[in-house]
Amino acid sequence: MAKLIVNADDFGYSEGVNHGIISAHKNGIVTSCTVMANMPGFEHGMALIKENPTLRCGVHMTLTCYKPLLKDHKTIVDENGNFFRRPSEEVLKNIDLEEVYREFKAQIEKVRERVEITHLDSHHHVHGEEYLRPVIERIANEYKLPMRQSSEMAIDGVTYAKCLGNFYMNNVKEE
């Protein structure tokens, strides 16, 4: 078993991100990635995964970037059909958790059709948000995959990979 996992998230975001992650993997830095199934670079990323079978692949469940895979959502998208980048308190109060579940499941299944999934995490660490706990518990129990721990929230029966969250929180700045 690996003693250190270096995971690169946002795989599938764009061709540039994909090439950067593949380069880091080929140079012995990155050992796994998590894929954004809803992003424009997804197909490109899947082609690169086939060429690099030693790169383990998880799903980077996405609820705050670009567009959902499913088009019938009402509460998790704006008037243009895009995910809310930073949902307001009003939006959060009215989210239909069934929509979130169906979207996360669609993302997982899209990746699973192409590659063996090794683990789960999420864009902007939304899987650690308490309001999504019922959805994350349901996904965790259904798929039985290890999950990156992003908060103190723990779900019975889920294996967590601890991460250096302080590095992210203290060093990554969003504009």
Feature names for model-found ranges:
Residues 1-15, 21:
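Boundary/entry segment of secreted carbohydrate-active catalytic domains
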Residues 3-5, 30-34, 54-60, 117-121, ...:
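Structural preference for beta-strand elements that scaffold enzyme active sites
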Residues 6-12, 61, 119-129:
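Histidine-centered catalytic micro-motifs
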Residues 15-40:
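A short alpha/beta connector and helix-capping loop motif
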Residues 21-27, 45-56, 74-78, 112-113:
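Acidic (Asp/Glu)-rich catalytic clusters
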Residues 50-68:
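Short, structured active-site "lid" loops
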Residues 67-95:
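Active-site gating loops and adjacent loop-to-helix segments of metal-dependent hydrolytic enzymes
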Residues 105-174:
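Catalytic domains of cell-wall/extracellular-matrix polysaccharide-remodeling enzymes
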